[in-house]
């Protein structure tokens, strides 16, 4: 059993995958994320991120993989009709199944039904999560420390990952307008989804800037929020900020399981230490701050 497979077993992720597979086999409705977290005996707060770290794929990608796997199993029956197979595993039509087969398996359903060797090869590849191919066990310098809480002005943005600087610019423009821009103390961010798994323009992110304790209210869509406070696992990342999610995965995959600590229901955030406009990407620094119980 691989290291990742052991971790999935320990954290209840295997139970989630088995449940999803059972739902597809029985043509049952797929459960909500909160139900999946309960099956894994994990808090729903960080479940999606933990699942991604231990499988290398989102729950949605797992469903897509298992749906194709079940379709291949049903296609092995020579009397099966492609339309019946498609509907049985949850596709809306035979065309939807054909499209998924072409995009992922580079073959049509009919070709896969007729070629037992090709079908078996894909069944073997689809039987394990994408993350089993990961080989990123490198030493991590993680420090557990109690962080002081700090207030930030937050602007939620929905768009391209590369356009986050525009949201930070809007916060800074407001701060300049009220005369506190020179009091900037922290630059932080909270990823509300994973830009690696989203189509272009669908990144959901909270951009945050700290100016100390504010005396005045902030106008919508800006809002106030408190970050930090309590124990955190802190990992210093050096490199492009687009790589922070992968570094977070490594922390959750390789440090957390043997740390003896549990995740706390509070935001995981990135504390940016350098300005990309002033510092080359290769040496940009940011602290990944993971809240712990």
Residues covered by each model-derived region:
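A solvent-exposed interaction/effector surface
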Residues: 45, 50-53, 61, 65, ...
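DNA-binding recognition helix and immediately preceding turn/loop
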Residues: 3-58, 74-94
């Amino acid at each position: 059993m691989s290291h990742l497979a052991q971790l999935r077993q320990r954290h209840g992720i295997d139970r989630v995958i088995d449940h999803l597979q059972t739902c597809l086999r029985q043509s049952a409705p797929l459960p909500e994320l909160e139900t999946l977290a309960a099956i894994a005996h994990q808090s729903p707060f960080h479940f999606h991120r933990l699942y991604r770290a231990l499988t290398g794929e989102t729950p949605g990608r797992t469903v897509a993989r298992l749906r194709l796997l079940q379709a291949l199993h049903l296609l092995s029956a020579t009397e099966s009709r492609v339309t019946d197979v498609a509907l049985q595993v949850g596709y809306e039509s035979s065309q939807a199944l054909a499209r998924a087969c072409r995009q992922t398996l580079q073959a049509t359903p009919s070709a896969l039904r007729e070629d037992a060797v090709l079908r078996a090869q894909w069944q073997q590849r689809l039987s394990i999560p994408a993350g089993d191919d990961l080989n990123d066990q490198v030493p991590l310098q993680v420090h557990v420390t109690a962080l002081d809480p700090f207030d930030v002005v937050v602007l939620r943005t929905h768009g391209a990952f590369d356009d986050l600087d525009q949201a930070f610019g809007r916060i800074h423009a407001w701060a300049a307008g009220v005369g506190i821009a020179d009091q900037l103390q922290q630059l932080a961010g909270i990823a509300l989804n994973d830009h690696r798994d989203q189509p272009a323009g669908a990144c959901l992110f909270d951009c945050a800037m700290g100016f100390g304790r504010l005396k005045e209210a902030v106008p919508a869509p800006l809002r106030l929020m408190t970050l930090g406070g309590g124990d955190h696992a802190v990992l210093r990342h050096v490199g492009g900020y687009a790589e922070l999610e992968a570094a977070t995965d490594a922390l959750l995959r390789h440090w957390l399981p043997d740390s003896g600590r549990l995740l706390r229901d509070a935001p995981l955030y990135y504390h940016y230490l350098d300005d990309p406009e002033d510092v080359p990407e290769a040496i940009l620094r940011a602290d990944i701050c993971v809240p712990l119980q």
